[in-house]
Design a protein with these regions (language model features):
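Glycine-rich ATP-lid/hinge loop adjacent to the conserved G-boxes
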Residues: 87-97
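Conserved micro-motifs of the catalytic ATP-binding
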Residues: 23-26
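Conserved glycine-rich
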Residues: 114-115
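Short beta-strand/loop element within the Bergerat-fold HATPase_c
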Residues: 49-61
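Short helix-loop "hinge" at the ATP-lid/N-box region of the Bergerat-fold HATPase_c
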Residues: 41-43
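Short conserved segment of the HATPase_c
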Residues: 74-87
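Acidic ATP/Mg2+-coordinating residue in the GHKL
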Residues: 69
Length: 142
């Protein structure tokens, strides 16, 4: 979170964390990039009183990390396409500056790291992005 602190402060986003004591074995640099994409979207599509909550929990030998915001959300009919290359949803088109590459690259990178990246959203209420880390023998702190 430290590397994305300026963006979050500048955007007025309050960050809450819960149970981030889980350990994963992964490439920290690329996971930081991946989280950056998710946090940038949360900051860009924020509500008037933006809050982003990061939480982690063990699921058997796997670890689930959730990044949830209370932003403007994604229309249900657009949700299946948000990871498509070049796709910019109606919210991105109306705000400008969107390339449609952020979530595409995030999904590709997650796959390369054997991390499952999923999205759930409700328009007007917010978005939840979930990273499911694979089970590994050698663990380091998240």
């Amino acid at each position: 979170l430290q590397s994305h602190r300026a963006l979050l402060i500048q955007s007025g986003v309050r960050v809450e964390t819960r149970d981030l004591d889980q350990r994963v074995y992964t490439d920290g640099k690329w996971v930081c990039f991946l989280l950056g994409q998710l946090l940038q979207n949360a900051a860009r599509y924020r509500s008037a009183q933006p809050v982003v909550t990061l939480s982690a929990r063990a699921l058997g030998r796997r670890v689930e990390l959730t990044v949830e915001d209370n932003g403007i959300g994604i229309p249900a009919h657009e949700l299946p396409r948000i990871f498509d290359r070049g796709f910019t949803g109606s919210n991105g088109r109306s705000r400008g500056g969107s390339t449609g590459m952020g979530l595409y690259l995030a999904r590709r990178l997650a796959a390369a790291l054997e991390i499952e990246l999923r999205a759930a959203s409700e328009e007007g209420k917010g978005t939840r992005m979930t990273l499911l880390f694979p089970a590994r023998e050698n663990l380091s702190k998240l």
